[in-house]
Amino acid sequence: MQKKVKVKPNSKQQKIEEQPDGSLTVYLKSPPVDGKANEELIKLLAKKFDVAKSDIRIKSGLSSRQKLIEIDRDV
């Protein structure tokens, strides 16, 4: 499964909002430095979709706020 994700680093609280178009807006506490925000994003998405962190990959947008995430789910 692939999801478009818009990341908002340096937020006061962590939360995930699903948009009407199916994309996600993810608010992260971590700053976008040294991959910390990406690590936090993967942890949050793994918890939300109930998968291992290793099942989530950032396909594009590694250094951008707009990302394409791939989630491997065994359903």
From Swiss-Prot:
GO cellular component term of the entry, any: cytoplasm
Record-linked NCBIfam families: DUF167 family protein
Positions of transmembrane segments: none
Pfam families in the cross-refs: DUF167 (PF02594)
Protein family: Belongs to the UPF0235 family.
Cystine connections: none
Protein name listed in UniProt: UPF0235 protein Npun_R3528
Signal sequence, start to end: none
Lineage of the species this protein comes from: Bacteria, Bacillati, Cyanobacteriota, Cyanophyceae, Nostocales
Chain intervals for the UniProt region annotation (Disordered): 1-23
PANTHER family: UPF0235 PROTEIN C15ORF40
UniProt-listed InterPro entries: DUF167, YggU-like_sf
